[in-house]
């Protein structure tokens, strides 16, 4: 059985984080908005390199994506802020390996903005609901301060030096326009809320004690249960303690309304100004401590549906699925690469959690959803799908590009877009005589294809021949994204056959030979997956794949040695493949990688030599001439687990060959 390479983050998962890429409390301040100000002249440079800074920023976004329970008064703005921050993920992935002083300075400043956004969003998740409703204007000022600072940092980014793709630059320009246009919004619900609060605090309005208004406010602010009111009391105490500048009138209004809500629940009104302030985290844990093993390592929340991944670690199913959907193929806790992305229910742990909760009378928290946000997204998608059939060229261009961005954003959008009937229309646009529409259509399909159901829908619509046509004749970025789309679709075995029969392999080999670095990587991953099909191995060999692969082995700077060796391993299982690669110079190259390559290089090269030698002992004899034996002995004790297995098998094969 031929071992194949572990496809990494440059594969299908990357479609979410790339358009054309291969490839987680602060006190609330009313007067002092400077808590989120980023003073450019005072930005301290961090010692991290650019790679580390990018990882930090991406980690912040991943953390923010897990935050639940935004206060209703700021919920929509919170979702908007997170969405805008996530737009930068593909750009960050694109510059991840770039190192320069100007890039480091830019990323340091960008991280400062993301940290400020994190503080604000945590406040909107944990802060006093009454205060945020009472002083919504100040909260909006803080959001707009973030927008202004983010725009300022992006405008001064060293784009020319970073050499990012034109499409990534267009997305950043579009984001900057959004940030500039962001207006302070007052929803109808907010107006009603403001009027109710004005009535409640009025000294002259006879309705100020009207229980119906109080009940309505309690419902809007979600302060209707005893637990809600206890949590709000702690939040207000912390606010008053931390915020020394909170004026007396504001304090009185907050406490007055809190006491009105308490009376509705039959609780005694108290003056919390004179009660000791208890830290919220301590309050939650003094009476009951959650067992560490019950908490998801990603969210640090109790697990409702624990599942086991390939490394044996357990996570909340929803959280780890989001991690995978974002294109990651590593364990979040151990950072190990995963052999597979299968999830196995941890029934034993789930039963333990349920028993513990029942025994301790622990109420499992419900996660909040945003139905308003979901409905808005559905409406937006419906309008975009309708616009795909417009007779106006510019409207078609705008809609397909916007859909492309939505499809990349999250798994939910991919399902929404497919359910709205977009896939047949997008497939039709692949043949549209406009290079921009073609490029955006094929990239949208690439992003949609991350979803397994969508893979089938796309191929059932007959998209593959049209994608191959763009691969042959489209512009540079369209060709690269077509290759990535073919890789994604080829995850289904029937599509491997269809792509091979549709003559999709020769243009992939051409892109591997003549494409840009990203184009080569897209082609390489697609060809690897297609070569898992026996008939496609022969097609790839006939298309001349061997020489481009050998060329990749000569240039370490391209960073594709392991991938090239992995495809050569597949080809070595084919008679024509062995004939094409079995040159003396290639055997010498393999031995050189076994001698002084990276651990993964050694693993892959040893695997290729074992496959060749298992079919023809002359390859073993040739390798011995280049001194391979002592290098294999070293690998048996110091190599990766797989490399050790392969080296031991190869040593046994050498012993048999010598006996013969």
UniProtKB/Swiss-Prot annotation:
CDD domains found in the cross-reference section: RING-Ubox_PUB
Ranges of the ARM repeats in the UniProt entry: 411-450, 452-491, 493-532, 534-573, 575-614
Segments of this protein annotated with the region Disordered: 1-29
Keywords noted in UniProt: Repeat, Transferase, Ubl conjugation pathway
Pathway it works in: Protein modification; protein ubiquitination
Biased segments, Acidic residues type: 1-24
Single annotated GO MF: ubiquitin-protein transferase activity
Superkingdom of this protein's organism: Eukaryota
Domain called U-box: residue spans: 289-363
Catalytic activity: S-ubiquitinyl-[E2 ubiquitin-conjugating enzyme]-L-cysteine + [acceptor protein]-L-lysine = [E2 ubiquitin-conjugating enzyme]-L-cysteine + N(6)-ubiquitinyl-[acceptor protein]-L-lysine
Physiological role: Functions as an E3 ubiquitin ligase.
PANTHER family for the chain: U BOX DOMAIN-CONTAINING, U-BOX DOMAIN-CONTAINING PROTEIN 15
Protein name: U-box domain-containing protein 15
Gene symbol of the encoding locus: PUB15
């Amino acid at each position: 059985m031929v071992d194949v390479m572990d496809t990494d983050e440059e594969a299908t998962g990357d479609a979410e984080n790339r358009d054309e890429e291969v490839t987680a409390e602060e006190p609330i301040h009313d007067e002092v908005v400077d808590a989120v100000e980023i003073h450019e002249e005072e930005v301290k440079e961090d010692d991290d390199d650019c790679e580390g800074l990018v990882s930090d920023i991406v980690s912040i976004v991943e953390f923010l994506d897990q935050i639940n329970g935004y206060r209703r008064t700021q919920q929509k703005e919170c979702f908007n802020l997170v969405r805008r921050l996530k737009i930068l993920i593909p750009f960050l992935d694109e510059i991840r390996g770039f190192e320069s002083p100007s890039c480091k300075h830019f990323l340091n400043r960008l991280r400062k903005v993301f940290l400020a956004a994190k503080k604000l969003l945590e406040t909107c998740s944990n802060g006093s609901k009454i205060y945020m409703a009472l002083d919504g204007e100040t909260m909006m000022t803080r959001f707009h301060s973030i927008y202004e600072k983010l725009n300022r940092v992006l405008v001064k980014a060293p784009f020319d030096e970073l050499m990012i793709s034109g499409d990534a630059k267009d997305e950043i320009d579009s984001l900057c326009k959004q940030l500039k246009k962001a207006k302070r919004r007052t929803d109808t619900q907010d107006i009603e809320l403001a009027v109710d609060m004005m009535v409640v605090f009025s000294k002259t309005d006879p309705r100020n004690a009207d229980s119906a208004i109080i009940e309505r406010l309690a419902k809007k602010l979600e302060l209707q249960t005893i637990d809600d009111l206890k949590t709000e009391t702690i939040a207000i105490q912390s606010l008053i303690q931390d915020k020394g500048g909170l004026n007396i009138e504001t304090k009185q209004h907050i406490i007055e309304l809190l006491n009105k809500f308490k009376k509705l629940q039959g609780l005694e009104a108290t003056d919390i100004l004179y009660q000791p302030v208890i830290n919220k985290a301590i309050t939650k844990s003094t009476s009951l401590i959650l067992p560490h093993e019950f908490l998801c390592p990603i969210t640090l929340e109790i697990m409702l549906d624990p599942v086991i991944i390939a490394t044996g670690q357990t996570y909340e199913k929803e959280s780890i699925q989001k991690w995978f959907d974002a294109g990651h193929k590593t364990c979040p806790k151990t950072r190990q690469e995963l052999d597979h992305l299968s999830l196995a229910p941890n029934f034993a742990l789930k039963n333990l959690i349920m028993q513990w909760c029942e025994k301790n009378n622990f109420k499992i928290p419900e996660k909040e959803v945003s139905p308003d946000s979901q409905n808005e997204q559905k409406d937006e998608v419906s309008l975009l799908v309708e616009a795909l059939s417009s007779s106006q060229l510019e409207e078609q261009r705008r809609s397909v590009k916007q859909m492309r961005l939505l499809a990349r954003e999250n798994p939910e959008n991919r399902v929404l877009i497919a359910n709205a009937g977009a896939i047949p229309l997008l497939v039709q646009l692949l043949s549209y005589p406009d290079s921009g529409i073609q490029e955006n259509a094929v990239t949208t399909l690439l992003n949609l294809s991350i979803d397994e159901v969508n893979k089938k829908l796309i191929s059932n619509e007959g998209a593959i021949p049209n994608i191959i046509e763009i691969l042959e004749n489209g512009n540079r970025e369209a060709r690269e994204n077509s290759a990535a789309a073919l890789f994604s679709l080829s995850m289904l075995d029937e599509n491997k056959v269809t792509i091979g029969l549709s003559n999709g392999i020769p243009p992939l080999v051409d892109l591997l030979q003549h494409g840009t670095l990203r184009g080569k990587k897209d082609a390489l991953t697609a060809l690897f997956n297609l070569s898992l099909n026996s008939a496609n191995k022969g097609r790839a060999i006939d298309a001349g794949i061997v020489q481009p692969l050998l060329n990749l082995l000569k240039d370490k700077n391209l960073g594709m040695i392991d991938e090239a060796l992995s495809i050569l391993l597949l080809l070595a299982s084919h008679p024509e493949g062995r004939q094409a690669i079995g040159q003396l110079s290639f055997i010498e190259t393999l031995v050189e990688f076994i001698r002084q390559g990276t651990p993964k290089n050694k693993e892959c090269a040893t695997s290729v030599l074992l496959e060749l030698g298992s079919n023809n002992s002359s390859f073993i004899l040739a390798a011995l001439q280049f001194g391979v034996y002592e290098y294999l002995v070293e690998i048996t004790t110091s190599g990766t687990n797989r490399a050790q297995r392969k080296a031991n098998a190869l040593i046994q094969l050498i012993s048999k060959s010598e006996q013969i």
